[in-house]
């Protein structure tokens, strides 16, 4: 009886793994948890994940309690977002832009962890500052799990080269 139960569990696990491989890792997570892109992040509302699986970076004064600050830039908002978008795509082959590009001062990307393809979303936004420079805001969040091991913060730090 015990052997039959163990064999049944092994077969079930094998079937789940085979389905995961056949359907594809990214699509499997999508079927389990829904689309990773849940729309734009509202930086003004400053809502964060209730679990430690996100990271927030902003130029001084643009958001409350960022994980780290990023310096304002001299470029116009649209150019700053375009530069950051190109840098992100160049550094992360799994990242793809998912926003409709109607607002050139905003961008949204979905990317995936290399091995298991866990989905993360990255939101970028730029705003003109009173001094003529452009302030930057970035929010990255894992769609699945309650922790990301600091990966989203690392991703933003690399994007803004703060290390």
Placement of each model-derived feature along the sequence:
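Ser/Thr-rich, low-complexity intrinsically disordered terminal regions
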Residues: 2-7, 17-163
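Acidic, proline/glycine-enriched N-terminal capping motif
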Residues: 13-14
